[in-house]
């Protein structure tokens, strides 16, 4: 599960994404620093960067769905259409997970030697709001000691394929995510 992630506004690529969104959507306010469910944050879509609320609104109005299992997203009614027509990229500088023991320890996971970490996401319009979820799969060795699931991490050469090619998207979610650096926060 991914319930928080980080956006460092000092990274040049992040600044460019924010500038493009502000140009396309004047007056929009997006979160930086630690991003929480329901916050508005940038996503990359086929049509360009856009602001999105984190979490699909539940049909019963009670809360949000913030993650989707990559293994079943294409079949589940909640995510099926978004998988086919609404794949997005969530640009971050890392994500957070906590240990499940009595004394929870918060960790930041980042790509070593990279400033950005791109997570696979799905989006759809709900009540005229662009909403997104983060796709997760089984944790790799870097994350498994802290949590059993992690976001699907996209490499730079996978971004366009993820956004535009459904067959390639299916293959991407089956791949293991790259090793990550873990830092206590």
Locations of regions flagged by a protein language model:
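Short linear sequence motif anchored by a di-proline
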Residues: 1-185
């Amino acid at each position: 599960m991914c319930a928080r992630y980080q956006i460092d506004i000092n990274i040049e690529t992040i600044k460019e994404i924010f500038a493009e969104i502000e140009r396309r959507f004047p007056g929009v306010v997006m979160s930086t620093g630690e991003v929480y469910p329901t916050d508005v944050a940038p996503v990359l879509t086929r049509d360009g960067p856009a602001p999105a609320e984190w979490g699909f609104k539940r049909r019963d109005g009670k809360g949000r769905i913030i993650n989707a299992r990559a293994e079943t997203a294409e079949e589940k009614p909640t995510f099926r259409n978004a998988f086919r027509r609404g794949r997005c990229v969530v640009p971050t500088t890392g994500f957070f997970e906590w240990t499940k023991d009595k004394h929870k320890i918060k960790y930041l996971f980042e790509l070593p030697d990279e400033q950005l970490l791109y997570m696979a996401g799905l989006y759809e319009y709900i009540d005229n709001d662009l909403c997104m979820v983060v796709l997760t799969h089984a944790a790799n060795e870097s994350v498994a000691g802290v949590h059993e699931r992690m976001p699907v991490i996209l490499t730079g050469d996978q971004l366009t394929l993820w956004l535009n090619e459904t067959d390639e998207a299916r293959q991407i979610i089956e791949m293991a995510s790259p090793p990550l650096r873990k830092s206590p926060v």
